[in-house]
Structures are given as C-alpha cells and as structure tokens.
C-alpha cells in the first residue's frame, strides 16, 4: 500500500452550495425566506435584544462587588504529599517542588495544609502554612520559614 492509494473509509460529504441558481433548489433567497433584517448579510438582532423593552441586564440592579483580579491563588499541598515525595532532612521550597515536577509554576505561591502524617524532619520554606501543619513539622524537629510572595514593585512617583 502506498500513500497515493489511501482513501477515507467514509467518503467526504459534499458541502451544500447555496445561492447558485434556482435549479439547485437553494437559489434566489438561499433558504433565508423573504426580505427583512434576517435576510441581509450580518442581519439579525443580538441574542440579548428583547425587542426594545428594557433588557433584563438593565432592569436588575448591580449588587455586591468582585475582588477576583486581586485574589491570590496558592498551590495547596498536604503533609502526606511532602512525606511521600521528600527524604529526611531535605528542603521543601517552591524551587525544589518545581524541579521535582511536583507542581506547576504560575500561581501565587505554595500553601501547606496539615492533612495526613509527617514522619520526616524537613526544612519547609513556603508562602503560607496552616497552624496544624506548622506544629507537625516542628514536632518532628523540622523548621518552617515563610517566604514572601514575589509581586510587582510599585514604581515611585515623581514629585
């Protein structure tokens, strides 16, 4: 078998060419009915248009506020996760987690939660840690260091 002998198992369906003469059955108005806004190119009203009455998005008042663009999203890891992936005496930081392909960068930092058990002495350098996780790390003789989240520094204004 050669490349030029290949053919699809199901033949390609020919597309319907509309507006190509009355004998095709799809000539003249090309399936768009008689005249009017919808028969024109780009015609028709927007999906949210309600015929001129006051639309729902303007009838309903605005409520609350959103702080979503300033929200910090942390990559959450557990003590059980650290126990599985790190050896005794190792350092846990954003760099070591990324180098071991355990997390993806692109979030605002790493947060450790106290789920599971920790049986190893670790040096933990993360952005946030829960009280129970901190207590568990220090109970095994490890240390906890909070690292600042790297962000944009504000430009000093000229006075």
Curated annotation (Swiss-Prot):
Keywords per UniProt: Ribonucleoprotein, Ribosomal protein, RNA-binding, rRNA-binding
Pfam families assigned: Ribosomal_L27A
Name assigned to this protein: Large ribosomal subunit protein uL15
Gene3D superfamilies noted in UniProt: 3.100.10.10
Record has Repeat as a keyword: no
Role of this protein: Binds to the 23S rRNA.
InterPro entries assigned: Ribosomal_uL15, Ribosomal_uL15/eL18, Ribosomal_uL15/eL18_sf, Ribosomal_uL15_bac-type, Ribosomal_uL15_CS
Any one GO cellular component localisation term in the record: cytosolic large ribosomal subunit
Entry's Gene Ontology BP terms: translation
Compositional bias per record (Gly residues), positions renumbered to this chain: 22-34
Taxonomic lineage from the root: Bacteria, Fusobacteriati, Fusobacteriota, Fusobacteriia, Fusobacteriales
The organism of origin for this protein: Fusobacterium nucleatum subsp. nucleatum (strain ATCC 25586 / DSM 15643 / BCRC 10681 / CIP 101130 / JCM 8532 / KCTC 2640 / LMG 13131 / VPI 4355)
Family: Belongs to the universal ribosomal protein uL15 family.
Domain of life: Bacteria
Gene Ontology MF annotations: rRNA binding; structural constituent of ribosome
Region Disordered: start-end pairs: 1-46
Subunit structure: Part of the 50S ribosomal subunit.
């Amino acid at each position: 078998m050669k490349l030029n002998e290949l053919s699809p198992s199901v033949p390609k369906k020919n597309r319907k060419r509309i507006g190509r003469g009355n004998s095709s059955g799809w000539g003249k108005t090309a399936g768009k009915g008689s005249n009017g806004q919808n028969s024109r190119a780009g015609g028709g009203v927007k999906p949210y248009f309600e015929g001129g009455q006051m639309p729902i998005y303007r009838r309903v008042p605005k409520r609350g506020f959103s702080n979503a663009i300033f929200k910090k999203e942390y990559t959450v890891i557990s003590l059980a996760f650290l126990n599985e992936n790190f050896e005794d005496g190792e350092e846990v930081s954003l760099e070591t987690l990324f180098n071991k392909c355990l997390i993806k960068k692109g979030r605002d930092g790493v947060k450790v939660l106290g789920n599971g058990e920790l049986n190893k002495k670790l040096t933990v350098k993360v952005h946030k840690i829960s009280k129970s996780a901190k207590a568990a790390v220090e109970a095994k003789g490890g240390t906890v260091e909070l690292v600042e989240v790297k962000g944009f520094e504000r430009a000093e204004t000229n006075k």
